[in-house]
Curated annotation (Swiss-Prot):
Belongs to the MAF1 family. InterPro entries: Maf1 (IPR015257), Maf1_sf (IPR038564). GO terms for biological process: negative regulation of transcription by RNA polymerase III. Keywords: Cytoplasm, Nucleus, Repressor, Transcription, Transcription regulation. Residues 59-114 are annotated as: Disordered. The keyword Cell inner membrane does not apply. Residues 102-114 have a biased composition (Polar residues). This is Repressor of RNA polymerase III transcription. One of its GO terms (cellular component) is nucleus. The keyword tRNA processing does not apply.
Amino acid sequence: MKYIDSLQLIGLNSYLNSIDVGDALLMGELEAYSCKMAGSDKKIYRSLDKELEELSNTNSGAMNITNSNNNTNNNNNNNSNSGSSNNNNNNNNTLSVSMNSPSPTSNISVSPFGPMSNSTSRKTMIYLIQLLNLSFPDYDFTDSKPEQFQKEPSLNLVINSINANLAGYIKDYYLEFEAKLWSTLESEISLQKCEIYLYKPENGDPFTENGVLFSFNYFFYNKSLKKIIFFKCRYISKLQILNDDGSDVKDPLPDQEELDDYYREYYDGDTIDNMEMS
């Protein structure tokens, strides 16, 4: 995969990168990636694709064995209880629930991307894994499982969720930023033609590290364009940033004025009250 420079996204990111909201920073970024694979990407892709396919085949085999055993038990129960219609009904009802209940081995076979026995489903998941590794080079998402992702059912739900989250932190969001955000994304990725996924944060990833008070992330994937836009946003405590910079945690906690001075020294972004939209 390859990072795509976009002047429109750069303009949005200059505003989203470091929004001062008092004792914390709202740090968001929009990144565009091409799904065309280079030499090293192809090697990683083949390795992950083989691993996911083998895991899918293994779990599918386990499910077939389970279903076969259930069918055998069903026949045995019917034969042994042929003299009692009530027992037959009870046994059949119990088996029906058991057969229709999700198997713990089915997660890899039926995923947010579709059946993992399907190469297209595996390809989509691998794209998202590779993108996460590029976006967060200090972390490794290679071992991520299908259940760590979620497919969003509706573009409108995603838009409403992002608007609500950002409006809670950004002054005059609906007046100055909302229209620019969504018109830019529409021109970049054709939102109506996108599949939208999110990554579910787990311990040890950048969305759950110390100081992250809130986060969201969305992948807007346009198959026909072979392009993904990744929208990541984290609400990070200024105090944690101060500690990460090497300050002595035994010192008295800084007051708000000290936190603001530290922020102004290390970040070039404007505060909310001095927003500049190009």
